[in-house]
Amino acid sequence: MASEPEGAGLLDDEPEEGEEGAAGDVGGGGDTGTGGAGGPEALPSPWAELPGGRRFGTLVHSAMERVDFFAPDLEAELGAVVDSQLAYHRMDLDREAFVAALAQMIETPLGPAARGMRLRELMPKDRLDELTFELPLVGGDIPKGKLDVRAIGDLLAERLPAGDPLAAYAATLCEAELGQAVRGYLTGSIDLALRFTDQELMAPKFFVVDYKTNWLGAAEEPLTTHHYRPEAVAAEMERGHYWLQALLYLVALHRYLRWRLPDYDAELNLGGALYLFVRGMAGPETPADDGTPAGVVAWQPPAGVIEELSALLDEGSGS
C-alpha cells in the first residue's frame, strides 16, 4: 500500500489563513518605494487587495490549471475560468481584480533560465498540468537500503558549486533532526510541466513550474514587487523547504521524461525549476534583478545532480 514518507511536512505548501511568509523583512522591509539601493522602482502588487490563505491558494491553482494561456482573447478566457471557479469554490472576492492579477502574472517574463518566455506564449501542446507522480523510496514496500534527508544534503554539498542557490540549503538538510529514516512512497503532483524549444541548442527544454501565493509583506504595508525581490523569495524558498520540494519534483519529471522520450538526455532536456511567487509578478514591467523579474525563482541543476539524486532515492545511501 502506498504511503507518504515520514517527514512529509517538509513539503507543506502555502501558509495557513492569516499566516505571513517570513521573508518580507529580508534586507529591510520598511522601504517599499524602491527595489533597494540602486535597484529598480517597485510596483504595487496586482494581488494586494486579494485575500490570503490556503483557500485562495487552491483557487489560484484551480484557475491556472484550466486557463488556456495561448487563447486569442486572454481576458475573456480568464473571465470564463474565474467565473466557473468562483462559483465552485464559493469565494467572495473582487472578480475584476482577480482576472487582472492573473493576466499580469501570465504576461510576466520568466527570466533568463526560460529565455525570457512568458506563460502567455505557452501553447496547450507544450504543457502538462497537475502531473501526478509516485516515487518509491529505497524499494517502496520492500526496502532495499537506507535513506534519510541528510543524505540528500550530503549529495548537494558534494556536488553543488559555492555560488549555486541551493549550496547553503544543503547545510540545512544535513542537520541532525532530519536524520530520521524515510521509506515508502512519495506521492504528489506538479502544478505545471512546460516545454519550450531552446533555439540555441535546438532541443526541447522541460521545466517544473510551481505557483506560490505566499504573502511576504508586513500586514501594515502596501504589498509591492519589492517584497518579492530575489533575497526575499530565496529566504522563503528555504524557510518553507521549497528547495527540497523542487528537487523531488525534478526527480519526478526526470523519471517521466526518461520513460516518455526515446532520446532523452537530462543535461540537454531537463531545464530546471521555476517557482512563481505570483503576488510579486506585475506583468511585462515587473522590476528585474539580473534579468529575473520579482517573484520568479529559477534553478537550473548542474549536470548529473538530478540523476544522482534519483539514484539515491531509489537505492539509498548504503550506510
Language-model features, listed with the residues they occupy:
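Structural signature of nuclease core domains in nucleic-acid processing machines
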Residues: 1-319
